[in-house]
């Protein structure tokens, strides 16, 4: 889909507490490694039949924010249609407060910057 896997992995580290799922709104059994569908406290978010489908949905959702290009594979992201396509072409704009379009993946301030800090730390290992 043209989305960087390292960015998706860093996002998954953020959303799952480095895959411990401590403090995460999602559980391992959901195969949801990005908090997809968690729109407020207490909401468990989307579930996927396999880890592969969960990761594909995450990549597709990131593409929805980053681009207006068509998907290359069948859509498995139930929330794809809710995204204003191309509204966050930069990782830094994934947080709604930082996005000049007022849109984004997460409402928390600095969301995209947190993803990039995790990625930087991984690359420095």
Residue ranges and their predicted role:
Residues 1-125:
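Catalytic cores of secreted/periplasmic lytic hydrolases that degrade extracellular macromolecules
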